[in-house]
Design a protein with these regions (language model features):
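Beta1/beta-strand and adjacent pyrophosphate-binding region of the FAD-binding site
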Residues: 1-9, 25
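Conserved Rossmann-like nucleotide-cofactor binding loop
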Residues: 9, 32, 225
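Glycine-rich FAD pyrophosphate-binding loop
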Residues: 18-38
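Glycine-rich active-site loop/strand segments that organize a redox cofactor
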Residues: 41-73
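Conserved redox-cofactor binding core of oxidoreductases
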Residues: 77-147, 151-159, 196-198
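Glycine-rich loop(s) and the adjacent beta-strand/alpha-helix scaffold that form part
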Residues: 147-199, 326, 332-335, 339
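An anion/pyrophosphate-binding glycine-rich loop and adjacent beta-alpha core
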Residues: 173-175, 179-268
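A glycine-rich dinucleotide-binding beta-alpha-beta segment and adjacent secondary-structure elements
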Residues: 263-319
Length: 350
C-alpha cells in the first residue's frame, strides 16, 4: 500500500492499515496544515448529539454537502473521545450551536501526529519527496493490485498570502484524475478564507483563532471602530464582513484574560494585531464515497484507489464548520486505511 501525504489524514490511514496487517509506504513532502490544527469537533456534551452536529455541519455548508459523508464523519467522531485525553475546556466554534470543539493543550494536530508517529515507529516505510501523477501511473502499471491512498491536502498554498505551506498546490488532484477519479468543486468559489490571519511581521500568514471573539476580543475596522454586531457568524460570513469594512481589521485582545491568551500560546504584550482574511481551506477535490473509495465520473468505484482529508470533496459544502478540518482528517483517514487494507485481504483470499 502506498499512502501519499504526511498530515493527519495520511498518518491515520497508515495506522489503520498497519493495524489490519498491511505493509505501508508513506510518501510525503511535509505535514501540511496538520501541526497547526488547534482543535477538532467531537460531540461529547449531554446537550449535544450526532444529529445536532450533522445539522450544524450542513447549515454551515449551506446544504451543499454530501450528507452521507457528513453523517459518517459526525457519527464516527464520537470514538475520538476514547482515543485521546482531551482537555476539559470545550470551545464553540463560529457557526456551532453548542460547544463541541475539543483539544489537547490547544495543539491537537501536532500532539496527535506525534503520538501516531511514535506508535508506528519502525512499522511504516517513510519517504520524504514529491510524488507525481506520472510516477503513480508507472507504479500502477507495474503492479495493478497496489492500493493507493491520496491524502495530499488542499491547494491553497498556491496563493501568495495564505495560511498553507507553499507546497500544498493540489498535486493529489492530478494523481486522482490520472487514475480515473472524478473531481468536484475545484474552483475559486470553493476556497474558504480564514477570517483573522496576521498580515505583518514574522508571523504573517498565521491565523489568530476566531473563538476569542466569544471571550472579550473585538474586531476593529481600519478607522478603529468596532463593526461586528454578531460574533456568531461563521467563518465565511466573518470574512465577508471584514472585506466589506476595509479589507483588513485590527484584532483587539485587550479584554481577553491573560490566562486565556497564555492557554493559546499568545504573546501577552501583543494586544492589537492587524489581520485579514486569507485562503485557508479548499472545500472541493476528489469525489469519494463514505468508505473513501475514489469514484469516477459515472459514480463507479476506481478499484484500489482511496482518498481522505482536505484533498476530497463533499464534506464541507460551501463553508467548513470550524473544527471540522481536523475531525474529517481523523475520521476519514482511519476509514481509508482500514478499507484499503481490507481490500488487500480480500484480494489474497480470492
Amino acid at each position: 500500500m502506498i499512502i501519499i501525504g504526511g498530515g493527519l489524514a495520511g498518518w491515520r490511514a497508515a495506522e489503520a492499515a498497519v493495524s489490519e496487517g498491511a505493509s505501508v509506504v508513506l510518501v510525503c513532502n511535509g505535514a501540511g496544515n496538520s501541526p497547526d490544527i488547534h482543535a477538532l469537533n467531537c460531540p461529547v456534551l449531554t446537550e449535544d448529539s450526532v444529529e445536532q452536529y450533522v445539522n450544524d455541519t450542513l447549515s454551515s455548508g449551506k446544504y451543499q454537502n454530501d450528507r452521507r459523508l457528513v453523517e459518517t464523519m459526525c457519527r464516527e467522531s464520537k470514538s475520538l473521545k476514547n482515543e485521546f485525553e482531551f482537555d476539559s475546556v470545550l470551545i464553540r466554534p463560529l457557526g456551532s450551536t453548542v460547544p463541541r470543539c475539543v483539544s489537547i493543550n490547544h495543539s491537537i494536530g501536532a500532539i496527535a501526529l506525534a503520538q501516531i508517529k511514535a506508535r508506528l515507529k519502525g512499522k511504516v516505510s517513510l519517504e520524504y519527496r514529491t510524488v507525481t501523477a506520472e510516477e503513480v501511473l508507472e507504479i500502477r502499471a507495474s503492479d495493478p493490485q497496489v492500493k493507493i491512498i491520496i491524502a495530499t491536502g488542499g491547494w491553497c498554498g498556491k496563493y501568495s498570502f495564505s495560511t498553507n505551506p507553499p507546497y500544498l498546490k493540489g498535486d493529489g488532484l492530478e494523481i486522482a484524475r490520472a487514475l480515473g477519479g472524478a473531481l468536484k468543486d475545484v474552483d475559486e468559489s470553493h476556497v474558504q478564507y480564514e477570517p483573522t490571519v496576521r498580515l505583518e511581521g514574522s508571523h504573517r500568514g498565521i491565523p489568530v483563532i476566531t473563538t476569542l471573539l466569544y471571550e472579550g476580543a473585538r474586531l476593529l475596522d481600519p478607522q478603529g471602530m468596532e463593526f461586528l454586531s454578531d460574533v456568531r457568524l461563521n467563518k465565511d460570513e466573518l470574512s465577508k464582513a471584514i472585506f466589506q469594512n476595509g479589507g483588513y481589521a485590527f484584532y483587539d485582545l485587550t479584554h481577553v484574560p491573560d490566562e486565556r491568551l497564555k492557554e493559546c500560546n499568545m504573546d501577552l504584550m501583543e494586544r492589537v494585531i492587524k489581520v485579514a482574511p486569507a485562503p485557508h481551506s479548499s472545500l472541493g477535490g476528489i469525489v469519494i464515497d463514505p468508505k473513501c473509495h475514489v469514484l469516477d465520473a459515472d459514480g463507479q468505484i476506481v478499484k484500489g484507489l482511496y482518498a481522505c482529508g482536505e484533498v476530497t470533496a463533499g464534506i464541507h459544502g460551501l463553508n467548513r464548520l470550524g473544527g471540522n478540518g481536523g475531525t474529517a482528517a481523523m475520521v476519514f483517514g482511519s476509514i481509508a486505511g482500514r478499507e484499503a487494507a481490507l481490500e488487500i485481504k480480500h484480494d489474497r483470499e480470492r
